[in-house]
């Protein structure tokens, strides 16, 4: 019960930070565009939905590791990630280039340490 409440709270904070990135920052949606930004070294953080295909997930993680880009595994599926981004379509992969006014990049390592 307590763990479920904590994950809901962290999900809400991630969603609110994502909305701020959508308004004030620069980002790309989609696998191909995200991979392109990672290879160019422009991506600061990559967010993957939990139902992202395994091959795509491993490729993104590999390229992110090479370019020293952070990867966050979003706890919702691609429909929920799309909704969190304010889009009416599914989003499996999202790369944040410039967070704008959001502190999403600084807050992600804390979130990941809490999950382990």
From Swiss-Prot:
It is found in: Cytoplasm. GO terms for cellular component: cytosolic large ribosomal subunit. SUPFAM superfamilies: L30e-like (SSF55315). GO terms for molecular function: RNA binding; structural constituent of ribosome. Pfam families: Ribosomal_L7Ae. The keyword Cytoplasm applies. Keywords: Cytoplasm, Ribonucleoprotein, Ribosomal protein. Belongs to the eukaryotic ribosomal protein eL30 family. HAMAP family: Ribosomal_eL30 (MF_00481). Component of the large ribosomal subunit. Component of the large ribosomal subunit. The ribosome is a large ribonucleoprotein complex responsible for the synthesis of proteins in the cell. This is Large ribosomal subunit protein eL30. It comes from Ictalurus punctatus.
